[in-house]
Amino acid sequence: MGILNRWRQIGRRYFWPHLLLGIVAAGFGVPLLPGGGQEMLYQADNCPSLSRQSAFQAGFSQLARLKDVPCRTTYAVDYWHQHAIRTVIRHLSIAWAPAPLPEAVAPLRVQHQVLLTTLGLLLNREARPPVLVRRLRSTGHVAFIDNRSGIRLTQQQGIRAGPHAAV
């Protein structure tokens, strides 16, 4: 029984927070790159023809740059995504509790505040449902479907699944 409690504690402390952080990162569309993301950011700024997914590779430290990137049009925060964001905000708020820090670590605190503010804004953003596209004008042309070959096959070979001739 002791080993089951240990596995449960490991899952609660390590697995679920990292999984939820991955869900939130996937919702941002921001893959976490430990290094080498700066060159791609420079290319994304200078080359408009590169796609968003391949060119804009940023980590959590460049969240302010996400406002310039066009978002997905069908993006909406559903219930489980909101739950994941709330849990990550709770974990990060506890982990990054204010403490007396030296001046050299002050920019890191600013990044933490930007991340928490961005997650809070994402959580409170009103989701727009996808817009229905309707045909604006209808055409009077109806395609003619020629069923004569099917009728001929049903008469010659006795196929019952084809169209029936009303003779």
Curated annotation (Swiss-Prot):
One GO term describing the cellular component: periplasmic space
Role played: Regulates secA expression by translational coupling of the secM secA operon. Translational pausing at a specific Pro residue 5 residues before the end of the protein may allow disruption of a mRNA repressor helix that normally suppresses secA translation initiation.
Subcellular localization, as worded in the UniProt entry: Cytoplasm, Cytosol; Periplasm
This protein's record includes keyword Nucleotidyltransferase: no
Species this protein is from: Sodalis glossinidius (strain morsitans)
Pfam families: SecM
Main location per the UniProt record: cytoplasm
Superkingdom assignment: Bacteria
Signal peptide: 1-29
Classification via NCBIfam families: PRK02943.1-1
An example Gene Ontology molecular-function term: translation regulator activity
Protein name: Secretion monitor
